[in-house]
Amino acid sequence: EGILYTHVQLEDCDEIIEQTILKGEVVERLLYELDGVRYPKHSDIPFYHRQHRIVLENCGTTDAEDIDEYLAKDGYAAFEKALFEMTGEAICKEIMDSGLRGRGGGGFPAGWKWDSVRKQPKGKKYVVCNGDEGDPGAFMDRSIMEGNPHSIIEGMLIAAIAAGSDEGYIYVRAEYPLAVNRLKTAIAKAEEMNLLGDRILGTEFSFRLHVNRGAGAFVCGEGSALTASIEGNRGMPRVKPPRTVEHGLWAQPTVLNNVETFSAVPLIIRKGAPWFKSIGTEKSPGTKAFALTGNVVNTGLIEVPMGATLREIIFDIGGGIKDGKKFKAVQIGGPSGGCLTEEHLDMPLDFDSLKKLGAMIGSGGLVVMDEDTCMVEVARFFMNFTQNESCGKCVPCREGTRRMLEILTRIVNNEGSLEDLDLLEELSATISETALCGLGQSACKPVQSTLKYFRDEYLAHVVDKHCPHCNGRKKVLQIDPVLCKGCGKCMKQCPMEAITGQIRMPHVIDTEKCIKCGACWGCCPFGAIREE
C-alpha cells in the first residue's frame, strides 16, 4: 500500500500487524505529521511530492545487496539491449540525443566523451567512475553507491560497450566504507550471474570492474588527479591537452564520468532519449540530485528536474527558512560554486543559467543562509577549505589562495582596508585565469560572488569595523560539555560537518569549519550550544 509509519516502537508492532496487515486499516497516530496534516504515504509528503526522482528512485526502497531486487525492477535490461541490439556508435548517438551532461561539475556532454573514446585507435581503453565526492555536506553520490550500486555498474557496462573497453574502475573515497562494501558486493553478485567478467552472457564482450579507494583529497575529484591516484601516484592534476578521452588512465583513452551520470544511462537506453529530453530544459535535460542543507526547515537529498527554480527548492521542498527568518543567500556548487541572492530565486536552475552568474551546479551542494549569516565569513570558510585542499602543484592556487585567505581573515576580524577589496578582486581574476586545474580556476567563485552581491558586508568590516551579522566573529560557537547529552541532532544538522563526537558523549565544534549558520543552535534540545 505504500503506507509510511514514523517513530515506530516495539510495542507498536502488534497494532500494525492487526490493523494494517490483517485489516488493511491505517494507524493514524503513527503517520508523518506536518502543520497538523497527516500523510499516509511517503510520496504524499510535500518534501517528496514535489521531487522527480529517477536516479534516486530505488535508494531506500530496494535491498542494495540483493541483485534479484534490482533485476525485478528491470535491472540490466538496458545493458542487455545495448549488448544484443545496439552498436557502440548507436549507444553514443542515443546518449548524445538525450542531451545527458555530466553531473559532477561543469556539465560536459557525456555522449561526446564516449564517442571521442570510441573513435580512438583500437587498443586498451578504460571506463572510470568518479565517486570521490569531496564537497562539504554533499552526499548524492554516496547515497547512490550505498543504495543502488547496480545502476552504476550497468551504466559503466553500457559505456564500455560504446567505447570498446574491457576494464573499469570505480574510485571511492575511503571515508565511504559502506559504499565500498556495497559496490564490492554488487560486483561479486554481477560476476556470479555472468553480467561482469569474461564472455558476458555468451558473447565476445568482456568487462572487468574494480573498486579503488582514495585517501579523500578534494583535488582527486579532478579527472587527471583521479587517474594519477588510481595509478598509485600522488593525486595531482596535469596540464591539458591532451584530454582524458585521449590520454587518461595509464595514458590510454578513458571514459570518465561521475556516479550520478552513469546511473542515468540505463534509464536513457531503456526508455529512450526522447523520454529523458522531456524532463528538464532544452539545453539541460533530465534531473539533478542536490544536498539541501543550512538554515532551511527540511534538509536532505532531493532530486528535481533541471530548470526548477531556487524558490521551488528552498520554499516548496525545503519548507522555507527556519524560525520564520528572511532568506538571504544560497551557496550552490560547494567550494567551487558561488553565492546567489533573493533576486535569483526565480531563475531556472541549469548549467548555462548559473554559468552566466558566476556560479556552477558542481556536484550539487545547496547551503541555504538566513538574514543572520555573514557572507564574508562564508567566503572565508570556503577559501579556507580550498586552500587546505590545494595540491600545491601550481603557484596561482598554492600561493594565491593562501594570500586570499589571509586577506579574508583580516577583513573578518575588522582589520582590513579598502585596498584589500581591490587586491581580492585582482587575485581572484589572476587565479581563475592561470590556475592549472578546475579546483584552482573555480576556487575564487565564493569570493567573487559575495563581493558582487554582498559588497556592503565587506564595507561594514573594512570601513565601519563592525558587522551587524557577526560582530567581527570574535565570538565562536561552543558546546557545553555538561549540558550536551550526545544525542547527535546537531551533527546531522550541521552543513559543514564541523561537529564531531560519539553518541551519548559530549560533542565538539571545529571552529575552523564552523560558519556560524546557527543550524545547531536551533535544533539542540538541551540548550548546550552557546556563543563565547
Model region roles, listed by residue range:
Residues 396-402, 489-508, 519-532:
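Iron-sulfur cluster-binding cysteine motifs and their immediate structural context
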Residues 50, 180-306, 318:
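Hydrophobic alpha-helical positions that pack around
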Residues 95-117, 159, 216-228, 234, ...:
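Conserved phosphate/anionic-ligand binding catalytic regions in large, soluble enzymes, centered on
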Residues 155-157, 306-322:
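Short amphipathic, charge-patterned alpha-helical segments
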Residues 62-77, 129-141, 244-249, 291-296, ...:
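Gly-rich Lys/Arg/Thr-decorated short loops/hinges at beta-loop-alpha junctions or inter-strand turns
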Residues 148-162:
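Histidine-anchored nucleotide/phosphate-binding helix
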Residues 31-95, 251, 257-272:
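Flexible inter-domain linker/hinge segments
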Residues 1-29, 78-95, 123-127, 131, ...:
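Ferredoxin-type iron-sulfur electron-transfer modules in oxidoreductases and energy-metabolism complexes
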